[in-house]
A protein has these predicted regions:
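Short secondary-structure boundary/capping segments
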Residues: 50-51, 86-88
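Short S/T/G/P-rich N-terminal loop/turn motif that feeds into the first structured element of a domain
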Residues: 1-55, 63-73, 94-102
Length: 102
C-alpha cells in the first residue's frame, strides 16, 4: 500500500470553508478512483506545536504506485491541486508531499 501524505501552509486569508471545499473535492475523487482506498484531511490540532507553519494535511491510501500515478495524472486532481497551491503560502513552496510504501 502507498500512503500519500500532503501538508500545506495555508495563507492566513484562506477560509476554512475554502479548504474544506478543496478537501471535499479530493475525497470525492478518491471515492470514484480505482485503487484509491481512503481520504482523510483536516487542520492540524497537534499539542506538540511542531507544525513549522503547516496548518492542514491530508492522507490518501493507494493500492499501488500505478494507482497513485493514475490519481496524479487525473484532470480533477490537477485542478484541485492548483487550488491548493493558489491557497498556500508561497505557492508550491508551501506544500510538502511524501509517499510511503507501507
Amino acid at each position: 500500500m502507498i500512503r500519500h501524505i500532503v501538508l500545506t501552509k495555508c495563507k492566513p486569508d484562506t477560509s476554512q470553508q475554502r479548504i474544506e471545499e478543496i478537501f471535499a473535492g479530493l475525497e470525492q475523487l478518491v471515492e470514484n478512483l480505482d485503487g484509491a482506498q481512503a481520504f482523510t484531511g483536516a487542520p492540524s490540532t497537534s499539542p506538540e506545536n511542531l507544525e513549522r507553519g503547516y496548518t492542514h494535511g491530508f492522507v490518501i491510501d493507494f493500492d499501488s504506485w500505478a494507482a497513485l500515478k493514475t490519481y496524479a495524472e487525473h484532470p480533477e486532481h490537477k485542478a484541485l491541486g492548483a487550488l491548493l497551491v493558489a491557497n498556500a503560502v508561497n505557492g508550491i513552496d508551501g506544500i510538502l508531499v511524501i509517499d510511503l510504501d507501507v
